[in-house]
Amino acid sequence: MSAPTTTDPVARARDAAARESWAEAYELLHDHDRHPERGLTADDLSVLADSAWWAGHIDESVTARLRAHAAYLAADDHRGAGLTSWWLYYEYAGLGRPAAAAGWLHRARHHLEDLPDCPEQCFLAMTAAEEASARGDHESALAASRRMTALALACGSPDLLALGRQAESRVLLAAGRRTEGIALLDEAMCAVSAGELSGMVTGWLYCLALTQCMEAADFARAVEWTNAAMEWCAPPWTGSPPDGNADTAAPATGTAPATEDTPAAMTPLPMTVPSGENPFRGVCRAHRVEVLDLLGAWALAEAEARQACREVPVDCLESAAAAYYAAGDVQRRQGRLEAAAVSYGHAHELGRIPQPGLALLRLAQGRADAAVAGVDLALACRSDPDHDVLGRARLLAARTEVALAVRDLPGAARAAAELDALAGAADGGVPLLRALADTALGSVALAERRPGALLPLRRALAGWLELRVPYEAAQVRMLLAAACRAAGDEEAARLELGTARAVFERLGAVPDARRAAALLSGGSRRRLPGGLTTREAEVLRLVASGGTNKDIAGALVISEHTVARHLNNIFAKLGVGSRTSATAYAYAHDLV
């Protein structure tokens, strides 16, 4: 498209906005608006508000939109005033000002509800669907979303039609109608990938779709749309990322262990969007962090989390909270417990309940009671899984793990059974939920010493491998090794342990790698010297490797009190009085 020939800055700004060259439009209108004698129309003020938002000036966007509303009212344009009111509702809600948001939503309804059918009413219908869905009134939510779609079809707007399909998809997913919901989401995303939509709606739909995919535990779609979203967000965010952009590279499948160069913890960062950047970039990157975490690209996930928190606009702080939480999960599994605690704390400050990660951190620290209380409270706060199936599934998986750690077999069995029911209720089957459920069922069967543990564990391993989720697959291999060893198949146990250890070492999951190494060393002999039990031998090996009681508790997922009790028993059985003497015994008897 050739450059505009007019010298009128407002006309040039309108042309720039039509081309979605928002930085140019903002600069022209911002400069023009500095002179009070040069008035802007209501439409021009709306363009200034939009361009200020894209340029990262949220407060200026709100101010311009307030002026636009007044100008529409002065012109007796209720459609313009109604749409502007709705956008003010949306912006104030994102800024954490619910009272102001509610007032502007009421104004939007006042302006639009009594008018004949018009495109602006689509936004009221979308909000009505969200409110009804939040109440659990799926019937009303579905009716509202379908009204939005009907209005969009009547006015011929691709933007509104795609938003209507997405809104209906979300309602259907919440109602448990997964197959229908996913089909509508795919239809909406076709319009996105084909470049049929405006930049605002494209970014909006990417963010909504990524959230829906993860909440619905549809990992394959989450990976696909995350990669597409990051390509679209890449400068100059016209749909074609520049060559060599690191953000568009295929995710790595593994990472090196944490080193001294790795930051100990993620510190709070200013969350502002640099002028000219895509405001959706940080939000999409935050979603990417969760995908990279599952894929085992931990170093990249942590780096991306840090970058996301720099890019997330101030009206999307929940995305920064999600990035901090994901970084905490990486740090916890790598044994960087203090750094994980800091990251979970930042997530909590930004409004996210940092569970189940915080409960698993407390378990690794030997604070089993705090772990139980944390995950139980989080489950009580999420009694309705409709809007976040994966979130509840992860809590139930953690509840199973924590219960087994404190030898609460009935509690573990209940959590695993609920997780199994959740996976079974998913329309069409969900591989990620099924793998979580099979892992929990197998771990409970193993703890109860039931012969049927191998079957669900084999299913779980196959599921995680198919999803290409390495850490969880390696964890299942540890359980399979225990089941094989209990069945007398030492060779199979050692194969599983060796593979698990290699994965843990590649990921930098230090505590798990140590645990696998200890179990490998212990499997070569049937009778342990000194009358030691298998667990006592594991503790002794970790003592000999220089581990503190805290290190040993984290590696074996037991409390420090239990470690101390094991050490007392070891000292008594071996007739030694110090860790040094116990270490010497371990080396003398080939226990290390």
Describe the residue ranges of each PLM region:
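Linker/hinge segments immediately adjacent to helix-turn-helix/homeobox DNA-binding domains
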Residues: 408, 414-415, 429-434, 443-447, ...
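Actinobacteria-biased recognition of intrinsically disordered, low-complexity terminal regions
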Residues: 1-8, 238-267, 526-530, 592
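Internal metal/ion-chelating core segments
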Residues: 149-244, 263-313
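TPR-adjacent "capping" and linker segments in tetratricopeptide-repeat scaffold/adaptor proteins
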Residues: 1-8, 345-347, 386, 425-433, ...
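Helix-turn-helix DNA-binding segment
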Residues: 518-521, 525-577, 581-592
